[in-house]
Structures are given as C-alpha cells and as structure tokens.
Amino acid sequence: MGPGLLCWVLLCPLGEGPVDAGVTQSPTHLIKTRGQHVTLRCSPISGHTSVSSYQQALGQGPQFIFQYYEKEERGRGNFPDQFSGHQFPNYSSELNVNALLLGDSALYLCASSL
C-alpha cells in the first residue's frame, strides 16, 4: 500500500420522500488521498432544523456520525475526533474529516428532519 493509494469518498442524498425532496450535498463525490482533509456540506429541506450525517462502508449498514438540531450537536456516534461537524444559522451543516485514512473510504449520507 503505497502513498499513492486513493481513498474514495462518495456522497448520496438521503431524506424523507422522493429524491428531489430538497436535501442536497456537496460535493456529490470526491477522490482524496490518505492524510488529506475533506469537508462535506449538507443543505436540509426548507423548514427542517435537524441534520444528521452517516457513514456507510462497503457491505455495511449506515453508521450514525452526528446530529445537529437548532445549531447544537444533539448526538454523536462512535467516531474518532478526526470527524467533526458544524451547523450554520441557515441550518445547513458540514462534516469535516481530518487526516483521511483508508478506512474512511465510504458512502456519506445526510438526512434532515423537523
């Protein structure tokens, strides 16, 4: 496993109702190398004030990373400190992952609720 090995980070919208329900993530996909930093942004459905983020590794079910409600962290899964988040006044949020590891290669999901 040389230093050129790529870590794939993919995103997929997850929300209530149809795909065009309004939850958006950016960027929609990324290719990063180990050791790099990544910021993933999530915009909730209009009127929703709660945003949750999940990681889904290949062959696994989604794992809860964190939930923000009214700009405060209300819950956190069993993830290391390299995973952090923030919710902005407009209720959009971001997930930051510092010093990417090969094991961080996964599908990252975002959901919003009232």
Curated annotation (Swiss-Prot):
GO cellular component annotations of the record: plasma membrane; T cell receptor complex
Residues of this chain annotated as glycosylated in UniProt: 90
GO biological process, one term: cell surface receptor signaling pathway
Signal peptide: 1-21
Pfam hit, one: V-set
Keyword Nuclease: no
Superkingdom of the source species: Eukaryota
Disulfide bond residue pairs: 42-110
Sorted UniProt keywords: Adaptive immunity, Cell membrane, Disulfide bond, Glycoprotein, Immunity, Immunoglobulin domain, Membrane, Receptor, Signal, T cell receptor
PANTHER family: T CELL RECEPTOR BETA VARIABLE 5-5-RELATED, T-CELL RECEPTOR BETA CHAIN
Protein name: Probable non-functional T cell receptor beta variable 5-7
Organism per entry: Homo sapiens (Human)
Gene encoding the protein: TRBV5-7
